[in-house]
A protein has these predicted regions:
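Histidine/lysine/aspartate-rich catalytic loop segments that bind and position anionic ligands
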Residues: 99-123
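N-terminal nucleotide/polyanion-binding subdomain common to many enzyme families
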Residues: 1-95, 99
Length: 123
C-alpha cells in the first residue's frame, strides 16, 4: 500500500508563501485534521518560524534533553538538516504542542559535532 501524501501550505491571498504572517495555530489545526503520521518541514521554515514567532531563542532546559511524552496521535516533525543549521533551535520545535517529537534527516556529510549534539539531546 502506498502512503497518502497531502501538501498543506499557508499562503497569502495573492498566492505568496513569504512576506505575510500566517496564523500558525490554525495552520497546524487544519494540518492535524488530516490525521497525518508525520509532517515534512524544511529547516529554512523552522529557522524562519523561530525568528518570526519567538521573542529570541529561549535557553535549553533540562526537559529539552528528553523525548516528549505526548499523545501518540500527534504527528512527528520530519526535518532535513544535513548541515546543522538548526543547532540550538530544535528545542523550540520539541516544545510545540502540535508536535509529537522531531525526526531529523541527516547525511554522511553532516558535521560530526552536530550529530553528537543531537545524540546528547536524544533526537
Amino acid at each position: 500500500m502506498l502512503p497518502k501524501v497531502i501538501v498543506h501550505n499557508s499562503i497569502s491571498l495573492d498566492g505568496s508563501l513569504t512576506n505575510f504572517e500566517p496564523n500558525m495555530e490554525l495552520h497546524y489545526q487544519i494540518a492535524g485534521s488530516f490525521k497525518p503520521n508525520a509532517h515534512l518541514i524544511g529547516s529554512n521554515t523552522i529557522e524562519a518560524g523561530v525568528e518570526l514567532y519567538e521573542d529570541g531563542v529561549p535557553p535549553e532546559e533540562e526537559k529539552d534533553f528528553e523525548k516528549p511524552q505526548r499523545d501518540g496521535s500527534l504527528p512527528y516533525w520530519v526535518i532535513p538538516d544535513t548541515s546543522g543549521k538548526l543547532q540550538g533551535l530544535l528545542h523550540t520545535c520539541r516544545r510545540f504542542e502540535f508536535c509529537r517529537d522531531i525526526i531529523l534527516l541527516l547525511s554522511e556529510k553532516t558535521p560530526k559535532e552536530y550529530v553528537e549534539h543531537l545524540r546528547e539531546r536524544n533526537y
